[in-house]
A protein has these predicted regions:
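Bacterial N-terminal signal peptides that target proteins for export
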Residues: 1-10
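Sec/Tat signal peptide C-region and signal peptidase I cleavage site
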Residues: 19-24
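Signature of exported/secreted
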Residues: 25-322
Length: 322
């Protein structure tokens, strides 16, 4: 499994250290939440999603992208075929450039890979890779021309390789559904485990990641509702600080050979990933999801120091037709 927050290589049913809050120890019987996958074939939902990103480096730069699409799960010989289609984007009135980009985004979104998942919900593979790659290739040729595309084809072949497309498709599924399958968690108890993942600013550098997760409460699947048919899952992870410092120091030791880079260094680097998922415990059908990543640090260049940060948040709201 490889959730967006970091590459989790064990399920939540692995040997994790559970730390029960004092309140749980002092009160009555334990409330165990049993998370099981049971999406029925024929599941259909509209999903509203928004991505917000703010980058601060002397000045602040923000980006907000919203979309609305259909999620559908159909029966498949190996389990379920999960597809994403009928993408809709906010109209850009009076802005031809923005309208053109919206058209491109709609075409690209229409080629989002379909997933094949096993009856137990585990991710198996993406469906029909060849047609996805052909469609993306055709779209880029139209945008850039054959000559411009020729210069980029090698890079795009890497980006659009079956392995790359599989990783991208699996990340979201595993973060929201896959990593929670068959976990039995005490309500209010905090669980911890350690894994390894690449640093956001140094993707070739792998460091230990520490994680905590819990079932916070039983809540309504509908925001503001009075029922308690769903649960709130909370997951936070961050890299081991000592390992980060060592990795950064070693990285910058290799930079003096690059002209102008010998006086640049990171004095601090902090990373925090967080997921909040409101889901049905008996089916793992999500209703509300928020996934965020904060990367911040202090960069030193000669005698000057500057703070840099990037905050990225994705939200999803699901409305089920059946």
């Amino acid at each position: 499994m490889k959730p967006q927050v970091f590459a989790a290589t064990c399920a939540l049913t692995c040997a994790c250290a559970a730390i029960a809050p004092a309140s749980a120890q002092e009160t009555g019987p334990v409330d165990t939440v049993r998370l099981r996958f049971a999406w029925p074939a024929g599941t259909v939902a509209r999903v509203q999603t928004t991505r917000f990103r703010e980058t601060i480096n002397e000045t602040a730069d923000t980006m907000v992208v919203s979309a609305d699409y259909r999620l559908q799960a159909d029966s498949h010989p190996e389990g379920l075929l999960v597809s994403y289609d009928d993408f809709r984007f906010p109209s850009a009135v009076g802005d031809s450039a923005a309208s053109a980009m919206e058209t491109v985004a709609q075409r690209a979104a229409a080629m989002v890979p379909k997933l094949i998942v096993a009856p137990d919900g585990s991710f198996l593979r993406i469906h029909d890779v060849a047609s996805i790659r052909a469609g993306l290739d055709s779209m880029f040729v139209e945008l850039m021309g054959e000559d411009g595309m020729a210069a980029m084809r090698e890079m795009l072949n890497t980006v659009m390789s079956e392995d790359a497309l599989t990783v991208m498709a699996a990340e979201e599924w595993n973060a929201i559904v896959g990593m929670w399958i068959d976990a039995d968690l005490e309500l209010g108890a905090v669980y911890q485990y350690e894994d390894q993942a690449p640093l956001p600013v140094l993707p070739d550098v792998v460091v230990p990641m520490l994680a905590e997760f819990m079932v916070e409460d039983r809540t309504s699947c509908v925001e503001g509702g009075s029922d308690t048919d769903c649960v709130t899952l909370h997951f936070v992870s961050w890299p081991d600080p000592d390992s980060v410092n060592v990795a950064i120091r070693r990285f910058f030791e290799t930079l003096p050979a690059i002209p102008g880079a010998d006086n640049i260094s990171f004095e601090e680097l902090d990373v925090e990933n967080e997921m909040i998922i409101v889901t049905e415990p008996g089916t793992l059908r999500p209703h509300r999801v928020q996934i965020s990543k904060l990367v911040s640090g202090v960069v030193k260049a000669g005698d000057e120091r500057g703070e840099v940060s990037q905050f990225d948040v994705r939200t999803y709201h699901y409305t089920y037709a059946r």
